[in-house]
Amino acid sequence: MVTTPDGMPVAMVHSQNCTSDLNAWVNLFRENLESFGVKVDTNTLYGTLYNKALEGDADCGGLLPYCYFSGEHITHFEEGRPLFARTPDSKFTLANFMRSHLFTSVGALKLGMDILLKEEGVVVDKLLGHGGFFKTKGVGQKVMAAAVNAPVSVMETAGEGGAWGIALLAAYRKNKTEGESLASYLEEQVFAKEESVQIAPDPKDVEGFEAFMDRYKEGLEIERAAVVHLH
């Protein structure tokens, strides 16, 4: 059984893949700009492209990427192939392209969360986002809120990712007072002076994400064929 360091039960969804494929595309866009003699710093590049995603169609205009650099146990893949597919009448714009890659970055995670939220009746008051996905303010946060249909909060430390969270757990084990719960320690010792920003899910984004996921699940056979035939 998985628990927090103070013994509280944990429901955990783990996915293998997230933004590796998206990062590869961002680097391709950087290479394209540099071919024209344009230099752009990393934060500006990511910020501009991530924010572009907010201009896209709610369902990503019919685009379908998979970010499977490796296998994904949630969808029963032992190997992965990053790929991008569309139909002739898909709305192939930069905004939809970026939006679809942000959506698919948490696609497998959403499938796992749907089991907890829709099948097992788990109720989420809010999520606290950490990691590079949330580094561009408001974008990954808005996408995640749509994915889980729940408010998502981020703090200034959001970009620090998992290593920061692990350090907090270690600090709790070392510094907690007798009987002090992890929740109390985090609230009173760690987050008391930290400002957070919360974004509620936009119903149109939620509906769009569900439509994207219908396409995602239907297209898994495309990914499976790529694993078999692309070497």
Name each model feature, range by range.
Residues M1-L128, F133-H231:
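Active-site core segments that coordinate phosphate-bearing ligands/cofactors
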